[in-house]
């Protein structure tokens, strides 16, 4: 009769050797957020990552860049002794790291604040095009589950410090992450390929029957000149609202339509050469 034997869980899969070529972790330059359970594209290329940034939800990835400072916090062993016995590890403290972004961005801060209840997965990208995640037993690198993200930093300049933005990442289970940590190394500029989206609005002008401006939702910045040429080339491919013609002239988008024009999805825009924007919907 077969006898089932128990293995010691602590050392059943335990070794202390080193890789023939140890990875030298670089400075993290970007964070990629995904909806929980969703992953980066398999066999990722720069083109696939850019497309994923513009994909329809929930497949879309959400990059935050460029990171210029890292302040780790937590993830330390919690120890406790019973009576006069030795200390034993009972658990690990919550891991709550803070990342500083290179420029203060009120729009990004507002978006992160609004997502306080969302449990994202996260990938971290370093300066050497290494993407860090976890091994979930499949061939595709998975993101690190987070309990949440939050913004911080300083909203205005002071005598010694300029306004700055930080992003906090709260690990859902730091011990599980360390046990399953993994990474992929790419041969293209991962950070450059990442294109976060900005909310914009199409605003009809009083001057000219068909004149429109494109403005950022947060801050009302006129960005017509940045996207006007590409949107006019895409014409009806970039717009809903039964648009028949689009011209970019004198700083305006001149849109001929029988309905109310609005931008198509970021996925469609990106396929037509318009990168980095999404129509704001109240």
Residue ranges and their predicted role:
Residues 1-65:
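Polar/acidic, low-complexity leader/linker segments enriched in S/T/G and N/D
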Residues 43-154, 160-163, 174-190:
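Extracellular/virion structural assembly segments
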Residues 101, 124, 168, 210-216, ...:
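Generic recognition of long tandem-repeat/solenoid scaffolds
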Residues 106-111, 126-136, 220-225, 260-265, ...:
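Short, surface-exposed beta-strand/loop "edge" segments at domain boundaries and coil↔beta transitions
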Residues 165-171:
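C-terminal edge-of-domain segments
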Residues 188-210:
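Beta-strand-rich domain onsets/edges
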Residues 204-226:
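Beta-strand-rich structural segments
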Residues 225-282:
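The feature marks long extracellular or luminal low-complexity segments
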């Amino acid at each position: 009769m077969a006898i089932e034997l128990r293995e010691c869980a602590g050392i059943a899969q335990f070794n202390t050797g080193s890789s023939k070529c140890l990875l030298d972790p670089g400075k993290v330059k970007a964070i990629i957020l995904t909806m929980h359970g969703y992953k980066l594209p398999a066999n990722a290329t720069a083109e696939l990552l850019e497309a994923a940034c513009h994909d329809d939800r929930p497949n879309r990835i959400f990059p935050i860049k460029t990171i210029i400072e890292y302040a780790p916090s937590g993830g330390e062993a919690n120890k406790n002794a019973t009576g006069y016995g030795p200390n034993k590890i009972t658990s690990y403290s919550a891991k709550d790291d803070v990342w500083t972004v290179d420029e203060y961005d009120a729009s990004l801060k507002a978006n992160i604040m609004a997502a306080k209840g969302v449990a994202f997965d996260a990938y971290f990208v370093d300066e050497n095009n290494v993407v860090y995640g976890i091994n979930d037993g499949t061939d595709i690198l998975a993101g690190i589950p987070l309990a949440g993200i939050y913004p911080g930093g300083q909203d205005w300049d002071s005598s010694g410090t300029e306004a700055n933005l930080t992003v906090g990442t709260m690990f859902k289970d730091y011990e599980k992450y360390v046990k399953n940590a993994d990474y992929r190394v790419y041969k293209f500029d991962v950070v450059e390929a990442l294109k976060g989206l900005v909310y914009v609005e199409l605003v009809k002008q009083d001057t000219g029957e068909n004149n429109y401006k494109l403005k950022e939702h947060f801050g009302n910045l006129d960005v017509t000149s940045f996207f006007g040429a590409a949107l006019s080339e895409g014409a009806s491919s970039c717009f809903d609202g039964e648009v028949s013609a689009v011209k970019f002239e004198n700083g305006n988008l001149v849109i001929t339509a029988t309905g109310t024009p609005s931008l198509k999805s970021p996925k469609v825009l990106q396929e037509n050469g318009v990168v980095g924007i999404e129509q704001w919907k109240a």
